[in-house]
Amino acid sequence: MERVPRRGRGEERRKQAQPPPPLRSHAQNLIIPFLSSHSLRKTQDTAELIAYQEGRFGSYEYGRYGNPTTRTAEEKIRVLEGAEDCLVSSSGMNAATTMLLALVPAGGHVVTTTDCYRRTRQFIQTVLPKMGVSATVIEPSDLGALEAALVSRPDTTLFFSESPTNPYLRCVDIPAIAALCARTGTLVAIDSTFATPLNQQACALGADLVLHSATKYLAGHNDVLAGAIAGRAGPVAAVRAMHNVLGGTVDPHAAYLLLRGLKTLGLRVTHQNGAALEIARRLEAHPRVARVHYPGLASHPDHAIAARQMTGFGGVVSFEVDADLWGTAAVVDAVRLPYIAPSLGGVESLIEQPTVISYWDQGPEGRAAVGIKDSLIRYSVGVEDVEDLWADLDQALERSKG
């Protein structure tokens, strides 16, 4: 008599019903594997796993340590930056903090610059001291102060600065800084978010590492959170090891959206460079504008540095209105095309008053201590027609007159 298979929970049948091996595909876009972990072959699993652990077999193990989509994004950014390796993480802030934790030892010392993203400053000034790490803060152009810091603290392991900086778009002399830091074996890390790899090749200029909030220009559509750190293989490996401990993993879909954004990076940045420069020039001539901060203008304190090491000056223009807090707010409220939002680098133009959107909780004294003026406006130029953007900004300046 033929035996009838015993009906159970179907676990064995479920295992046997695994999907077939992937077909060779000629798809134009990357296929995203949504996995938290990766299984190995059903034959010689342990031997293959040992080979993977010893670096003799290329594969993926666990989602926090990497996945094919993220690795593809890392490779593209690596090539764009002319770097040896690249790590993509969950945000630009995650990339910065993971780097600092990985490369600055307990009791160590770091040098940074005055004008920078608020949360980076907060991490350096309030979190690192808990591990005995001290910091010297210098003006972006003050090479003498950097040299003095390196002499007084030869244990300085890292110089870290944005270039251009946020929000005043100061530029540091990367080759000169790299030469000074080489004397003491100090690593140089440059946050090149405002520049992009198209406008500035920080690694070629002497930086050991270059960081990006990939949320901004690299992804470019105001719909992704991601960070990237590229550079020499050794420091990137150290950051990757720390990243694997801390987490901060970007998910495969976000990595895919980042890859999508990279496809149009050249088109977007070329337009934004030209439009921002034109808007900066017109703002400088406008009677209601007291000062314009844009490295493409000869009036900018670091224009000579920017002209030497950048091929374009980026899509962000900061400017000061001849008005008080509420008069400046009236300009921001009167624009029609940009969104009022705290980001930059996307296809849509964005505008903000840093006093209100980023530093309101600091109070007047706190804002003054870090150089944030009530009259300051930061404008991130998108891909809209420059004449439309200017007409809108001009009418906002006129309408808001007291």
State what each model feature region is.
Residues 1-60, 402:
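N-terminal glycine-rich, Lys/His-bearing helix-loop that initiates the first secondary-structure elements
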Residues 22-28, 39-40, 68, 230, ...:
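Positively charged, small/polar-rich N-terminal and surface patches that mediate targeting and assembly
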Residues 42-94, 119-127:
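Conserved N-terminal alpha-helix of the aminotransferase class I/II PLP-enzyme fold
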Residues 84, 125-126, 134, 148-152, ...:
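PLP-dependent enzyme catalytic core of the Aspartate aminotransferase-like
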Residues 86-288, 293:
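Conserved PLP-enzyme active-site core in the AAT-like
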Residues 289-377, 381:
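Conserved C-terminal alpha-helix-loop-beta "cap" of PLP-dependent enzymes
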